[in-house]
Amino acid sequence: MQGPSRRHALGAVAGLTGLAAAAKAQSRDGLAGYAINLDTWCKQVPFEQRFALARKLGFKTIEFWTVDRGNGTPASAIRKLMDDNGLAATQFAPAWPNFADPAKIPELLKVTEQAIADARVLGCTKFTITGHALIEGMSREAQLAGYTAGLMRMAPLLEKAQVTGLVEPFNRVNHLNHLLNGSQPALPMVRSVASPRIKLLWDFYHMQLEDGDLIEKFTAGADQVAHVQIGDVPGRHQPGTGEINHANLLKAVRAAGYRDKIGLEFMPLNQDDARAVEDMLALGVA
């Protein structure tokens, strides 16, 4: 009887181990609606090592800032790191000239063409548009007109490539001297461009600092939003560390019709990536 009983016990343990592994895998599926930002997470290791760490943490989708990391990194090198680790990219953030200045339009178009080419290599269809630092000696009205004109010049290129440019407004608390802050005037500006490929990146960290009234304002502008990012206030850490009710907020985001990944462009508190993952799983909505 000892032999069969022992085999039975070992089988039971193996079964429980399998169930535990399955439960863990299922819990990690709770990250499926999110994209880890590789420039704000996993900062204890070099950029090239963050892909493997992101996958180990349970993510399948990433976002990041520039393709060129200052050493001539081609998009193909990043794509290889993605493929080697079973990751997809939802969007990235090229470096832009301050194109409210009409003299910067040729550079703007060149950067746009390169960003489109990089997006093709990376297999993603979105990238962030900034380039709205205030220009000394140029009126605000002229800068708004110039920036809008630049977006209109970009639009045909993006439409032809079927890639979406994401205009990202900042905030005036800790992102000083920028033309676009909060939902105004970015939302009416993007509406005026009237392109299916010029939309908004709605970062709730910036919106809380600049606007507040998060759910109502997002719902009013949701038709112009093609990417969402989150980060709690204060500190720009994970949900649960600050004042934003992310459970209600993200339910409202989905109810308003946003279906794509939610970018996690925040710094995990105390650089504890594993704890930040647990906090995201505990949030229970994506």
Where are these regions (language model features)?
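Active-site acidic/histidine proton-transfer and metal-coordination neighborhood
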Residues: G15-L19, Q26-G30, R55, D84-N85, ...
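Active-site-proximal loop/turn and secondary-structure-junction residues that shape catalytic pockets
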Residues: T40-C42, T66-D68, A95-N98, A133-I135, ...
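Metal-dependent catalytic neighborhoods of phosphoester/phosphodiester hydrolases
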Residues: G72-I78, I105, R140, D272-A274
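Histidine-acidic metal/acid-base catalytic patches
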Residues: Q2-A35, T40, Q44-R55, G123-C124, ...
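Mid-chain, structured segments of secreted extracytoplasmic proteins
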Residues: S76-L108
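N-terminal substrate-binding region of glycoside hydrolase catalytic domains
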Residues: L57-G72, A93-P97
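Glycine-rich, proline-tolerant flexible connector loops at the mouths of alpha/beta enzymes
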Residues: E63-D83, G131-L134
